[in-house]
UniProtKB/Swiss-Prot annotation:
Its EC number is 3.2.1.14. One of its GO terms (molecular function) is chitinase activity. Keywords: Carbohydrate metabolism, Chitin degradation, Chitin-binding, Disulfide bond, Glycosidase, Hydrolase, Plant defense, Polysaccharide degradation, Signal. The gene is Cht9. May play a role in defense against fungal pathogens containing chitin. This is Chitinase 9. It comes from Oryza sativa subsp. japonica (Rice). Pfam families: Chitin_bind_1, Glyco_hydro_19.
Amino acid sequence: MKATTTAVALLVAAAAMAAQVVAEQCGSQAGGALCPNCLCCSSYGWCGSTSDYCGDGCQSQCDGCGGGGGGGGGGGGGGGGGGGAVEAVVSKELFEQLLLHRNDAACPARGFYTYDALVTAAAAFPDFAATGDDEARKREVAAFLGQTSHETTGGWATAPDGPYSWGYCFKEEIGATASYCVPSAEWPCAPDKKYFGRGPIQLSYNYNYGPAGEAIGEDLLNNPELVASDPVVSFKTALWFWMTPQSPKPSCHDVITGQWTPSSGDIAAGRVPGYGVITNIINGGLECGFGPDDRVANRIGFYQRYCDVLGIGYGSNLDCYDQRPFNSGLTAAQ
């Protein structure tokens, strides 16, 4: 959004086209190579951990590396550990397909957001993409990438491959001049530091940088630049926001995994389970409760594209047009 308004007019040559020619990764198609991280090698030479990879025709590591690893995706809840839950839902090649144009020459964040950085960051949040059945896990990844893609989009209406193929084009707010510092005894601003939007969720304000840094073991009040210079830290801040409830708001994770039960006050305010409540959590004060809004529609567009690629349904209540915003509190993006 901060990045979005600047990026709408982004025009690029059609150089980085959708034709991704990616060589097979394993098995007979790749000289007998094994998949990394104990993933299964499918009959077609691709690495993954779902039944499509580990089932009929699997060439190697079909039961993981000596039992316990690998597996066939799905199953009940529980933590993934080691970032494996994300890997089980989204392979590296699928990640490249979802965030198709993030490394385009016109994107300021090109080369920054990597699959390995996401997997490493997710290891610090073992419940992410590890709660519920296979469809629920995929839906959480689609929702997370959908919301963060809107925050970092470089797309426009007639962009190559459509506007929803241009997530993760930005890593920090463009043209920020304000410090985004709110006086706080608990999270005091450091001299000469600015807390404008950075990273996938466009983390903003000292009262977000402080607790996010504390949670992930980084001093982000004194070093807010880390969110735009270290891709693992960057993803960790977004996942921290996603996984952490901030009363009266539930966590995005609890909403998308069906673990949030709205109160009578929530129901009266139109806040019912679904993707729309996540938009309300992130930026409801500016986007929700005012009727149709292009920003809300953009968030939905990304989410729907990712659900389509992952082969899952969207669920209900996708927008927040008629929802009253939560009380002012955590505001990750403007």
